[in-house]
Amino acid sequence: RFSGLWVGLTTMKDTVEATSVVNGDPNRMKLVTPQFDMPEGGLNIRLQDTPHLQEARMIDYKRFAAEAFSHANKMDKRMWGKRGAKIGIAAAGKNWLDVIHAMSLLNIDENEAERLGITLYKIGQTFPLDMKGFHEWAEGLDLVIVVEEKRKLIEVQIKEALFSDTHRRVYGWHKGGGAGMEHGEELFPTRGALDPIWIAEKLGGIFIEE
């Protein structure tokens, strides 16, 4: 509601076909309203709204409002590792759980990851990505690995954020490139689903090389 945008959720059988006891208290979360320069009338729907004005608000304000809300409420978090790490792994949703499982298959826990110079970033809002939070996490990294199945929404935003950075590499769909097999080994395909064993095999190979 803060940004006036629709919110979409990608659901998977691995999570929706499960049961759990949850806390339904509406006050269990304390949301922060960020400082943001709103246009006249705010960002939500109103009477006598023209397509031109709707488009202008979308492009000039709404994406940035959603990003500001994400940053203020820390939807994306550094989970493992600390500043000074050299390898960063970013993932969201089920892929985040798969990464944790994959790390356990490699016998790497939080302490071992810190010793090896590895940091993990859990993304709660995949678009728009909290660029300020991402840059804070990625500072000093030599390599960012994006574990993401299907369409590469997070990877594209990260590569855009680091476009002019010649020191940091980004691996995702492919190893060291964009679309197309000529850009290197395929790591995390856009077809099918990823699983912890596949991810562990790819991450293990990268860790050995690095």
Language-model features: locations:
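Flexible, low-complexity linker and terminal segments
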Residues: R1-E210
